[in-house]
C-alpha cells in the first residue's frame, strides 16, 4: 500500500486513490488516461499537482495509484488505523477490477468522499449494473457506485450517464472539501453550480427508485419534475 505524508484535520480532501486488480503497468496507464484524461509514466505511484477542470471550476488534486493480488487483503490494510490519515485526505476511492458480489463495497464511513468500482468484466451488462446501483442507492449510508468500463452507450434507459461519462460526472460533482477551487463562471445564485448538478442527479435517482415498481402517467411525471424544480430554486408551498 502506498503512503505519503498528510497534515492537519483541516487539510484539503484533494487525493484520489485508484487501485487496480491488474498489476500490468501499461494497462494501468491506459485506464488512467481513459478515466482522468492524463498521461502518467510507467511506475508512477503518486502524481501531484494535477488539475480537474469542468466548465464551472478547476481544482488541483493528487493521484495515488496502487494495485493488489487479493482485494480482501488490500481492503483490510486500507481500512487499518495505519492509513486513517490518508483516508481523511481522500476526495475519492476508485477500484478498477472485475466486479464480484462477494468483494466488499463498504465505504468505511468515508465522509465527503466518493467511492467508485469500475467494472472491467465485459460480460456484466448495464442492466445488471443498474440493478446493483439501485440496491446501493437504497442504502442511505452508501456512497458507493458501480460503473461499467465497457458500456457501449453514454446513457441508460432513464437518460442517466453510464460508463466513463458517469465516472467523470461523479468526479465533477465531488465536494472537494477544504480545497482551493477556482470558479470559472459567475452566477447570481448563492448555490455553487456543481452542487446544483449534484442535487439534480441525486433527486432524479431518488425519484426513479421511488416509482420503480409502478407505472407513471404524465401527471405523476410532471409532479416529479415540479418537485425537482422547486427544490433547486428554494421555492416552498
Swiss-Prot record:
Protein's UniProt keywords contain Cell wall biogenesis/degradation: no
GO terms, molecular function: protein-macromolecule adaptor activity
Keyword annotations: Chromosomal rearrangement
InterPro entries: Irc6 (IPR034627)
One Gene Ontology biological process: vesicle-mediated transport
This protein's record includes keyword Membrane: no
Gene3D superfamilies per UniProt: 3.40.50.11960
Main function: Involved in gross chromosomal rearrangements (GCRs) and telomere healing.
Family of this protein: Belongs to the IRC6 family.
Name of the protein this chain belongs to: Increased recombination centers protein 6
Species name: Zygosaccharomyces rouxii (strain ATCC 2623 / CBS 732 / NBRC 1130 / NCYC 568 / NRRL Y-229)
Lineage, broadest ranks: Eukaryota, Fungi, Dikarya, Ascomycota, Saccharomycotina
